[in-house]
């Protein structure tokens, strides 16, 4: 088994993670699979061999029934589950969302799935359950009453929070993952600020259980600065999880290897995480491209990990006093040049 990747001087939990969906069969909206699908539990040893200490999964990938076997296998591999997440986007029943659907029967099913996922999260030993906003949104104006949709989100997350608090105390926390669009034209919980406001509207007892799982590509699709998104989460004490990848412009969600498209901003991100003493696991949400052969399917993960380690060690060497000096002197162009030297220099 490969030696797990670690980050030098990382505070708290060390080791990297990736999702079982990261090494899928290569299907996209314009074409079917280019590789044979790999059984989900067979993907855990592959992630371990790629140097991952943590795995992540949706409830349609590792089901509640599979969870005990997955937990046992993970222990054997020396892995842990970093996060578990219910899929509110794949099944046809959730074509117009789960919590925000106009159909009360669909909302009821979504809540049942969410509560079941809380139980499975505990079985897998994960500390975090993620809610991605997937199909919670609209394609046509006035298709939903936006104020009602917001109230349904508050009501839904309150139910989940109270259920978890009653049954598991603070054993499980919840990280909402914002995205502005895709698969919907417009999505609720589109950005970090929107999610922070949503959390502020939850019942006081459950607010401490809710935070965020920001993803690089999701911020960049919206034309936002991912570093600032992370800083905002940190300032609010709500950075519960993180997904790293790369995004080449404001296009479809590409899930490219971390460090590929904007390495200088990625360097700055790691400076921020180091200075904040971020103690959680660092995980990737990347996707093996259609063109990769089955034997190379984990390249997307190992390339991301090596880029992260290289940038992390560069970030450790960034002189924070120099940054402060550039700020005091208002030499911000010079600051950008210094960061470039830190990135590209010896």
Predicted ranges, named:
Residues 1-48, 141-142, 158-165, 169, ...:
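Histidine-acidic metal/acid-base catalytic patches
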Residues 3-8, 76, 80-81, 93-211, ...:
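Active-site acidic/histidine proton-transfer and metal-coordination neighborhood
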Residues 35-63, 124-125:
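Catalytic domains of carbohydrate-active enzymes, especially glycoside hydrolases
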Residues 54-56, 83, 130, 243, ...:
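Conserved beta-strand positions in the central sheet of alpha/beta enzyme cores
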